[in-house]
Amino acid sequence: MEGWQRAFVLHSRPWSETSLMLDVFTEESGRVRLVAKGARSKRSNLKGVLQPFTPLLLRYSGRGEVKTLRSAEAVSLALPLSGITLYSGLYINELLSRVLEYETRFSELFFDYLNCIQALAGTTGSPEPALRRFELALLGHLGYGVNFTHCAGSGERVDDTMTYRYREEKGFFASVVIDNNTFTGRHLKALEEREFPDVDTLRAAKRFTRMALKPYLGGKPLKSRELFRQFMPKRTVKMKKD
């Protein structure tokens, strides 16, 4: 694509002595694989530009699976993620790299991604609400349509006090059994509205998105989750000392 378009780098790795292989998420073309020739050389004006969470304008060309980056400019400084928000950002980057096919347009998802990164950069509390909203948006764009407001069995609106079990591709059915795969009507309404007023609804949202994303991710664990697990004990120890 010869024209300029907005983009973010999801991941990069060395490619030859002076170049980079990039996995980028673009507004118009979706996920694209690019070679940035000379980007690692000392004199490259791309040094420090092709970083995750930096809003970019870029141009590329080529007809194969791997395109060639022609030029790139940072629209602004990288969004300031650190600590837990940095690991959260790495998680959604890896999520996109795992579930999106190359060169499939997801313009609305691009802005959901931007909104999530901005929310992470601006939060002073837990990143969990922003992550759950993004996961739900991603599932919607992947065609994973779920009716959170009505019981799939009776067709009636869900009741806050009742329990429902999710059946893949069918929806939520009333259930007398309560376990890790069931949700209350209150949980389902929170998922529909994407508002999580307390720890209980946040945990329920995390259970659902993990369940729903599993078929897309397969059996291979996410590296960012492992990094996050390693980070959390250190963070807990530091908080106790403080």
Swiss-Prot record:
UniProt record, GO biological process:
DNA recombination; double-strand break repair
Give the gene that encodes this protein.
Answer: recO
Record-given protein name: DNA repair protein RecO
- Tell me, in a sentence or two, what this protein's role is: Involved in DNA repair and RecF pathway recombination.
For this UniProt record, give its keywords in alphabetical order, as a comma-separated list: DNA damage, DNA recombination, DNA repair
NCBIfam families recorded for this chain? reco
What does the organism's lineage look like at the top? Bacteria, Pseudomonadati, Pseudomonadota, Gammaproteobacteria, Enterobacterales
Tagged with keyword Oxidoreductase:
no
Q: Name one Pfam family in it.
A: RecO_C
Quaternary structure, from the entry: Monomer.
- The protein's organism comes out as Salmonella dublin (strain CT_02021853)
Alphabetized Gene3D superfamilies for the sequence? Nucleic acid-binding proteins, Recombination protein O, C-terminal domain
User: InterPro entries recorded for this chain?
Assistant: ARFGAP/RecO, DNA_rep/recomb_RecO_N, NA-bd_OB-fold, RecO, RecO_C
Task: Note the PANTHER family from the entry.
Answer: DNA REPAIR PROTEIN RECO (PTHR33991:SF1)
**Recorded family membership:** Belongs to the RecO family.
User: GO cellular component terms?
Assistant: bacterial nucleoid
